[in-house]
Every structure is written in C-alpha cells, then in structure tokens.
Amino acid sequence: MSFNTIIDWNSCTAEQQRQLLMRPAISASESITRTVNDILDNVKTRGDEALREYSAKFDKTTVTALKVSADEIAAASERLSDELKQAMAVAVKSIETFHTAQKLPPVDVETQLGVRCQQVTRPVASVGLYIPGGSAPLFSTVLMLATPARIAGCKKVVLCSPPPIADEILYAAQLCDVQDVFNVGGAQAIAALAFGTESVPKVDKIFGPGNAFVTEAKRQVSQRLDGAAIDMPAGPSEVLVIADSGATPDFVASDLLSQAEHGPDSQVILLTPDADMARRVAEAVERQLAELPRAETTRQALNASRLIVTKDLAQCVEISNQYGPEHLIIQTRNARELVDGITSAGSVFLGDWSPESAGDYASGTNHVLPTYGYTATCSSLGLADFQKRMTVQELSKEGFSALASTIETLAAAERLTAHKNAVTLRVNVLKEQA
C-alpha cells in the first residue's frame, strides 16, 4: 500500500483497522541474541583487550587510547563554528529550564499523630550515555541526556560512542559537563558500561539509542544481576498527526517527512476527518520528498505509513490513543482542546508553529521518548529517570502505640509471626516502662 492511498477508517472491518495500526515488525534474531551474549561475556572477562578487538572488527579502527583526552576535546571545539556552538547553548538553556522545573518537593507528612512519613529523592550515582556514530552524529541526544543528569546531581556521567567520535558529540559532552568520553561503540560499549573494564567505569544505569545490537545488549544487561538498569525499551521512530481542514498541508507533510527520514523502519500516520486534506498532504509529501537528500530511505518508511480519513476529530483522538504514538502532532483550529482526551503519547505538539523538530532540539522537552506502543505504560525521559525516590518513617512512642494493635492484627492474618513479634516485644517494653 503506497502512502498516497487514502483509507476510509469507517469502511474498514475491525481486523483491517487493527492491521492499519500495526507497526513494522522488530525482533532480535537468534543470531543477534547469541552474538550480543558472547560480546557481553567476552568484555566482562577480558575488558579493554576485548573492546579493542571489537573496534578493529566492527568499526575498522585501531584504538590505542580508549579514553578521549582533554586535548582532543579542545581541538574538536576549535573546529566547530561559533554559530553551532551558540545554537547548542540555546538548546541546553531550554532543556535545563524545563528539566529543572521537574524537581519534586520533598514529601513530609504525619499520617497520624506521632507517625511521620517522608519521601526524598536522591540521584542515580553513576550513569552511562551511549551515542551512536555514523554519518549523522546525534549530538542533540548528548544534550538531552547529559543535561538532566547534571541537574539530578549524578556524581559520575560518562559517554561512549563509536570511533572516530564526531566533533559535535565531543563538544556537546564538554558543554554538558560529561566527565569522561570513551572511543567504544556497539554492544561492546554497553557491556563496558554495565560491567566495567580497566578504562571504562561500571555505571548504575545506561541511557541512549542504538542499532539492533545495542538495543539487544541493553535488554540483556538489564536482566542480569551483575548488569545495569536502562532508560526504556527502544523501537523505530514514529509520528502521528491529527489535522483538520484548517491545517496547512505543507506543514503537515514536512512533519511527516521529518520523522520518516530517520530510517526505513520509521512509521508516520495522518488522521483527518477531511478527505481533501489527506489528498493535499499526499501531494505535498511527494513535492517535498523529491528535494530530500535522504529520499530513498524516507520513501521506504512511507511504505509502512498511513493516510486515514475519520468521521470526526473525536474519532481521531480515539484512534491515536489506541496507537499510542511516540510523537503526536495536533494541527487543528483548537488544538489544545484535544489534549485532555489524549491518554497515550510520548510528546505532543500543538498548533501550526510547533513542529516536531522543536522538541527534537530546542523547545526544552526531552526527545528521548517511548516508541512502539510503550506510551501505554512508559513516559518521556525526564529528571526522574536520573533519580530514585526513598521513603523515611519515624514513629514516636505514642505513634507506635496507636498503630501497634493494627500491625499485630495484619501480621497475624498473613501468618508472619516474626513481623508480629517485632511489634509485640516493643509493646511489652512500653508496658513495663509505664
């Protein structure tokens, strides 16, 4: 089905509707699973030596120093334009402002007289950031990960990226106070961060996107007792646009294409109650696609994408919630009025002047988002992902006495005698002191 095929949602059967909202299949093949498992075990056992071997094998690079020196980072900074540096600074300021506002006030309450309960936050002590390499280095992801890590107060923030590391990534790391950067990529980088090597420190939590091997490595280390926690499950990029007859077709098309160009497994969907809008967007997509340098990749993504005509905007919202997009763009006359009805989306963009690109780079929200339907249970990355909550309770004698019989009754009902005894012993001491 080509992208310019306009589909009438209400003419489809329930099964056809289900098929329309299916995402491109992703699964780690058995060979990827086995390969990644071998890489993890090898790096855990042989450390830096294994990292250098994998760099030669996969990156075709001889790495002498795994850690990037301060001189190399300074040289990278010198090679970048002032314009790009200024743009990064503006983006960091926006990200910093939004994520600082996410700080939670401490909770401190008396649940009843003499029973004080608190909730406090503490930073994750050490985090590792993974940034893919390639022809289009994702330096913006450095800003999105390192900025909240700094605000949260993480004591150790390190970064891994395949060699040779782009100047933009090195400068972004410096700008955001990343302490150490390492010339290591792929599943072996995830292994190094999870287990530690002679050069790369073991971290508590790993963040960042990657290919199928990186994604599988993150999954595996998160399930190993000696591994590390991870940010969230990863999948291909996606966007869903809700547009009415008042939307600008060229704007809608540009937003769809900006997501489709990420890769052939990306998916874009347009929902509109206006069939003419769907037709005009399809025409605009074809015009703009012809001008894109990544047109071939983008066209592959469009093969799994949809133009869907609905009964009304309420049905658009219903379908969007069923799909749960990573990015949701609402280009309608009264876009904000639809927000209360949205239950599942990674990040929402309202109105003609809120392109997804703004959130990808500089509006301040985080561009690390749940994909592949995980918006039903997962949230966009935020300050909380770099922190942990801890509860504190303190009972006075009076507070303990008031709760004692309740605790004893509940513990006895669950047949946890030692739990009950921990209370009864104290009750008896209080009786003796009386």
Swiss-Prot record:
InterPro entries in the record: Ald_DH/histidinol_DH, Histidinol_DH_CS, Histidinol_DH_monofunct, Hstdl_DH
Entry GO terms, CC:
cytosol
Which domain of life does the protein's organism represent?
A: Bacteria
Q: Catalyzes what? A: L-histidinol + 2 NAD(+) + H2O = L-histidine + 2 NADH + 3 H(+)
> What does the record note about the cofactor?
Binds 1 zinc ion per subunit.
Keyword match Zinc: yes
Active-site residues from the entry: 326 (proton acceptor), 327 (proton acceptor)
Name the coiled-coil region(s). Answer: none
Keywords from the UniProt entry: Amino-acid biosynthesis, Histidine biosynthesis, Metal-binding, NAD, Oxidoreductase, Zinc
Report the cofactors.
Zn(2+)
Where on this chain does Zn(2+) bind? 259, 262, 360, 419
Assembly state and interactors?
A: Homodimer.
- What does the record give as the function of this protein? Catalyzes the sequential NAD-dependent oxidations of L-histidinol to L-histidinaldehyde and then to L-histidine.
Protein's UniProt name:
Histidinol dehydrogenase
> Where does this protein come from, organism-wise?
Shigella flexneri
